[in-house]
Amino acid sequence: MREIISIHIGQAGIQVGNSCWELYCLEHGIQPDGTMPSDSTVGACHDAFNTFFSETSSGQHVPRAVFLDLEPTVIDEVRTGTYRQLFHPEQLISGKEDAANNFARGHYTVGREIVDTCLERLRKLADNCTGLQGFLVFNAVGGGTGSGLGSLLLERLSVDFGKKSKLGFTIYPSPQVSTAVVEPYNSVLSTHSLLEHTDVVVLLDNEAIYDICRRSLDIERPTYSNLNRLISQTISSLTTSLRFDGAINVDITEFQTNLVPYPRIHFMLSSYAPVISSAKAYHEQFSVPEITTSVFEPSNMMAKCDPRHGKYMACCLMYRGDVVPKDVNTAVAAIKAKRTIQFVDWCPTGFKCGINYQPPSVVPGGDLAKVQRAVCMISNNTAVAEVFSRIDHKFDLMYSKRAFVHWYVGEGMEEGEFSEAREDLAALEKDYEEVGGEGAEDDDEEGDEY
């Protein structure tokens, strides 16, 4: 088996995790207490869904996941929630005091105490796997725990599980909506380690997803649950092929191979279609070309940046439901014929497609309508650099006055780490610029960086 372990860090990671596991359980017919009435082979571990769930001899299905937070309130909601019997109690790890929006607390002081417990759990989970394929890491980089503890854990995973893929689903601070003053610091410090210790990162941004909820689902004031439902649909679509047997399956390592042209350029945009409320769904039909066109719409991107400002290097289209390869080929050909969607000149094909016949499920009482087919796209576009330059700009404004820096230094960080991380991001922006530049004749000079 090719198992995958999910790691949910900090409040954002855990709440997105709740939505995801709720959806996985629905899709596989697993009850909130972990039983699966439809599973004929009790205790045997060779069904496709065993990539995400391990199975006990009594027929209980346990998520291969760890929830990790420095303070207990969010994890306590999982401990007392609907799915409390689903998770192994030792997989829900919480500390006593939180990181207070401070990267240094999550990374150096408070986080250090909890990270070994977490690695111990991960080691046990990994021992239960026959062929561990990699990790999915869910966190946000604006707060203290997601950024600080998230980075610390990624660094330790690189040491303990060197060659295993690490895919990040990371919530980046939004341009207009901010939840903490020091977000730019935490994001820059944390991106510094995402650059080195993850293989692919899918950028998500609350503001972009708010806009999608408002526009497409007619929710006037979207809550985090609305956002997380949409995020979990996207993540579910990306992992469908790992959990079900499909027509064209896509492995975790295939994402890497097809999407990452250079090791540092691994930050992806994602989009999902059709996002439609139940009220409207009756009156519309969504053909494969239609949903394919809409995942390329700038307004459907789950991060605030405009793909028209950049060029695509590669994209992965994951279809699910009633879709046949012939439709996909036609739709992709139509996209290629469009002049609006630009690819870099050194990557002429640029499309990787996956198809899975399992139709999308929806959470009862959720916002999304039940549809016959859906598509999720992850794309590598040079416009992602906009996200970084925005955060860098805010970082510079604060750091030029050394505002708030003493909180970080007081927790055992050195000022040098700020400038080091900032320089790394400046180099990243430059990398994106060069990759998107015309012609590939300057490749030889680029070679020294990697």
UniProtKB/Swiss-Prot annotation:
Binding positions (GTP): Q11, E71, G144, T145, T179, N206, N228
Post-translation changes: Undergoes a tyrosination/detyrosination cycle, the cyclic removal and re-addition of a C-terminal tyrosine residue by the enzymes tubulin tyrosine carboxypeptidase (TTCP) and tubulin tyrosine ligase (TTL), respectively.
Annotated residues for binding of Mg(2+): E71
Residues the UniProt record annotates as site (Involved in polymerization): Y450
Matches recorded under InterPro entries: Alpha_tubulin (IPR002452), Beta-tubulin_BS (IPR013838), Tub_FtsZ_C (IPR008280), Tubulin (IPR000217), Tubulin/FtsZ-like_C (IPR037103), Tubulin/FtsZ_2-layer-sand-dom (IPR018316), Tubulin/FtsZ_GTPase_sf (IPR036525), Tubulin_C (IPR023123)
Quaternary structure, from the entry: Dimer of alpha and beta chains. A typical microtubule is a hollow water-filled tube with an outer diameter of 25 nm and an inner diameter of 15 nM. Alpha-beta heterodimers associate head-to-tail to form protofilaments running lengthwise along the microtubule wall with the beta-tubulin subunit facing the microtubule plus end conferring a structural polarity. Microtubules usually have 13 protofilaments but different protofilament numbers can be found in some organisms and specialized cells.
Coiled coil: none
Name of this chain's protein: Tubulin alpha-1 chain
EC number: 3.6.5.-
Enzyme category, top tier: hydrolase
Location(s) in or outside the cell: Cytoplasm, Cytoskeleton
Coarse class of the protein's main subcellular location: cytoplasm
One of the record's GO cellular component terms: microtubule
Biological process according to GO: microtubule-based process
Keyword vocabulary terms for this entry: Cytoplasm, Cytoskeleton, GTP-binding, Hydrolase, Magnesium, Metal-binding, Microtubule, Nucleotide-binding, Phosphoprotein
Cofactor: Mg(2+)
Family of the protein in this entry: Belongs to the tubulin family.
Other notes: There are six genes coding for alpha-tubulin.
Record-annotated active site: E254
Disordered: annotated segments: 431-450
Keyword presence, rRNA-binding: no
Modification Phosphothreonine occurs at: T349
Function: Tubulin is the major constituent of microtubules, a cylinder consisting of laterally associated linear protofilaments composed of alpha- and beta-tubulin heterodimers. Microtubules grow by the addition of GTP-tubulin dimers to the microtubule end, where a stabilizing cap forms. Below the cap, tubulin dimers are in GDP-bound state, owing to GTPase activity of alpha-tubulin.
